[in-house]
Amino acid sequence: ANIGYYSLIFAKLVGKNGKVYAFEPDPENFRLLVKNIRENKYNNIVPIQKAVTDKSGKIKLYHSMEHRGIHRVYNPGGKRKIIEVDTTTLDQFTNNKIKPKVIKMDIEGSEYLAVSGMRKVIKKNNVIILSEFWPRAIRKCKTSPKRFIDELKSYGFKINYIDERRREIRPIDYSSLMKICRGGKAVNILLQK
């Protein structure tokens, strides 16, 4: 969730009867997220100070000293402070009681780990996923971009590229997606069944 920019947008979209669950493991970002929610008077955002991954427990977070939005679960080098943060899975968090309609992920290459921890959620709900796709970071998290896409397709998701320059969303295959990401580029994808 970082400091809540998208959480506030989604909270407005879901209205008073909807809920936004905003996960942010970094203590300082979490403090700013809570402050942002309070100052904007949103009662339908539930902040959770945990990272979403493939298991519940603890994980090392390599904390960026330059940019509060690029903390990672792998060591990317550079000046980093290591902190230990709590983790959860969406399967455990929802516990068959919360039925998400939309999941937004921009977790610096850890998206495959998060998907691995939400298999029940994906199977039981007709969920839409908005996700960052950054092959370089996915590899640093010890999986392959193809494995991530294949996992999503195995649940029946169609992959769509969000072309921000052209302001359009269009279906895309894996090889075309990888061509767009050449040179270390990260893009956003929309996944729908």
Model-identified regions with their sequence ranges:
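Phosphate/nucleotide-binding beta-alpha loop and adjacent structural elements of enzyme active sites
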Residues: 1-193
